[in-house]
Swiss-Prot record:
Residue(s) of cross-link: Glycyl lysine isopeptide (Lys-Gly) (interchain with G-Cter in ubiquitin): K15
Function: Molecular chaperone; assists the folding of proteins upon ATP hydrolysis. Known to play a role, in vitro, in the folding of actin and tubulin. In yeast may play a role in mitotic spindle formation.
Highest taxon of the lineage: Eukaryota
Family, similarity comment: Belongs to the TCP-1 chaperonin family.
Species in which this protein is naturally found: Saccharomyces cerevisiae (strain ATCC 204508 / S288c)
Subunit structure: Heterooligomeric complex of about 850 to 900 kDa that forms two stacked rings, 12 to 16 nm in diameter.
Name of the featured protein: T-complex protein 1 subunit theta
Keywords annotated in UniProt: ATP-binding, Chaperone, Cytoplasm, Isopeptide bond, Nucleotide-binding, Phosphoprotein, Ubl conjugation
Modified residues (Phosphoserine): S505
Cellular location(s): Cytoplasm
Entry's Gene Ontology BP terms: chaperone mediated protein folding independent of cofactor; protein folding
CC per GO annotation: chaperonin-containing T-complex; cytoplasm
One GO molecular-function entry: ATP hydrolysis activity
Length: 568
């Protein structure tokens, strides 16, 4: 009797080469195990004392960061269940800017504790129902835990309350300098609210960052306008600062238009050759004179600048700057109010822009061109000039600034100004409240709700671990501070008890009001929503079916024997 080999299920349904993983093979447990690997990797990067990771992507670029969204974006992840969490962190990054590590760690912890529930016999449906009930309860409780609100969004000191904790979680120790830079740059571009309660419009693209090697972070500064990491093309390098200067922006080349087809010109003598070149010179001279007669003192070109055109522009005393990036060209038009012109010729008065200062500066060893507006006016773009010793450090600082700017964007939302206690104080309080809610819930769903509360313990525990504190000592002290009310204390004083990452107190607990450590309500709500949805999505998957990858046969990787051009 011949041996009968088992076949893949649905072998006649899909093409050859597909893979299928179902619950019969322990698919959920395997997905949780795969996510746990990523969860452990991001765990040590959370908080102000979080460790950095060195990532070498598929292009060989070295990235040093502790931001979960950046790490996951650069890694080539193929597991479909893990990709669900990657998309969740990306969504948090796009919408709120901050809280990406919280999304990844909380979602991973929710799946870790769900594994215990599955081993106890609970079905995935019951766990999902319990998690959704706990999520709705948590969002309601967060509204009751608000301890402050930023009312004046144009006040620089109020902005610092919200920007500083965001940046300190990425670049601890440099948060004072960076938060001052971000708040100053935001104050330059943020319009003043005309009415009480009006929310000003803020565009994150209005804050630009220019990185210049050399010096230290304390040498960084903010320019009310734009900075280009190149100098002008001609002899004119700067314009006087006693008046406003007219600016013309061209997206076409500053040169004679050439035909697409080649032509031949027959010249009989030297005079014909001189007359031929004179025609070009007169045409270019006439164009540049028309531009100069309009009072233009600065030209920004998005394409090439011909030598002949540059010669006449130097003669008329016009500064010429080449900006190859169409995005930078668009931002410069916003700064000076100019209209980009696709044709070479004299612009109309409505198409010209105005700028107060155009000058070339030497910062470090680089020459940069600065377009600066008046101090009393609201600029549409502000630029932060960063100084540092290494390119990797500058890139990481830029990502921290981007998070701070994105947090300002979240602040401009209707409920963005409300603040929650930071340093793990909110999570400790949520554990107590969600656990009590689970005890009031009948049936098996209370097990899932209680485990949902247990998952929040990962935040204060990780903050204490990365700070080098004894977790077994800090967590009990933190629970006691939230459950025991001191004599004469205000009823809500326990909400402000968080993890002391500096180790100034023996108990590892401090009042977060001393350091103004707050979290944004909108960011926390969005992170809990996204993390819970990602975890329940993974739990709801009962089978993974992966088709065969597209593509033909791969070329041999090793060297061919013999000479390189030898025939087969």
């Amino acid at each position: 009797m011949s041996l009968r080999l088992p076949q893949n299920p649905n072998a006649g349904l899909f093409k050859q080469g597909y893979n299928s993983y179902s619950n019969a093979d322990g698919q959920i447990i395997k997905s949780i195990a795969a996510i746990r690997e990523l969860h452990q990797m991001c765990l040590t990067s959370m908080g102000p004392c979080g460790r950095n990771k060195i990532i070498v992507n598929h292009l060989g670029k070295i990235i040093i960061t502790n931001d979960a969204a950046t790490m996951l974006r650069e890694l080539d992840i193929v597991h479909p269940a893990v990709k669900v969490l990657v998309m969740a962190t990306e969504q948090q990054k796009i919408d709120m800017g901050d809280g990406t590590n919280l999304v990844m760690i909380l979602a991973g912890e929710l799946l870790n504790v769900s594994e215990k529930l599955i081993s106890m016999g609970l079905s995935a449906v019951e766990i999902i129902q319990g998690y959704n009930m706990a999520r709705k309860f948590t969002l309601k409780e967060l509204d009751e835990m608000v301890v402050g609100e930023i009312t004046d969004k144009n006040d620089k000191n109020e902005l610092l309350k919200m920007i500083k904790p965001v940046i300190s979680s990425k670049k601890y120790g440099s948060e004072d300098i960076l938060s001052e830079l971000v708040s100053e740059a935001v104050s330059h571009v943020l319009p003043v609210a005309q009415q009480a309660g009006e929310i000003p419009y803020f565009n994150v693209d209005s804050i630009r960052v220019v990185k210049i090697m050399g010096g230290s972070l304390s040498n960084s500064t903010v320019i009310k306008g734009m900075v280009f990491n190149r100098e002008p093309e001609g002899h004119v390098k700067s314009l006087s600062e006693d008046k406003k200067h007219k600016v013309a922006v061209f997206t076409c080349p500053l040169d004679i238009a050439n035909t697409e087809t080649k032509g031949t010109v027959l010249l009989h003598n030297a005079q014909e050759m001189l007359d031929f070149s004179k025609g070009e010179e007169k045409q270019i001279d006439a164009m540049m004179k028309e531009i100069a007669d309009m009072g233009v003192e600065c030209i920004v070109a998005g394409a090439g600048v011909g030598e002949l055109a540059l010669h006449y522009l130097n003669r008329y005393g016009i500064l010429v700057l080449k900006v190859p990036s169409k995005f930078e060209l668009r931002r410069l038009c916003r700064v000076c109010g100019a209209t980009p012109l696709p044709r070479l010729g004299a612009p109309t008065p409505e198409e010209l822009g105005l700028v107060e200062t155009v000058k070339t500066m030497e910062i470090g060893g680089d020459r940069v061109t600065v377009f600066k507006q008046e101090q009393g006016e609201i600029s549409r773009t502000s630029t932060i000039i960063l100084r540092g010793a290494t390119q990797n450090n500058l890139d990481d600082i830029e990502r921290a600034i981007d998070d701070g700017v994105a947090a300002v964007k979240g602040l401009m939302k209707p409920s963005g100004g409300k603040l929650l206690p930071g340093a793990g104080a909110t999570e400790i309080e949520l554990i107590s409240r969600i656990t009590k809610y689970g005890e009031r819930t009948p049936g098996l769903l209370q097990l899932a709700i209680k485990q949902f509360a247990v998952a929040f313990e990962v935040v204060p525990r990780t903050l204490a671990e990365t700070a080098g504190l004894d977790v077994n000592e800090v967590l009990p002290n933190l629970y006691a501070a939230h459950n025991v009310t001191e004599p004469g204390a205000v009823k809500t004083d326990h909400l402000y008890k968080g993890v002391d990452i500096d180790g100034e107190s023996d108990e590892g607990v401090k009042d977060i009001r001393e350091e103004n450590i707050y979290d944004m309500l909108a960011t926390k709500k969005f992170a809990i929503n996204v993390a819970t949805e990602a975890a329940t999505t993974v739990l709801s998957i009962d089978q993974i079916i992966m088709a065969k990858k597209a593509g033909g046969p791969r070329a041999p990787q090793g060297p061919r024997p013999g000479n390189w051009d030898q025939e087969d």
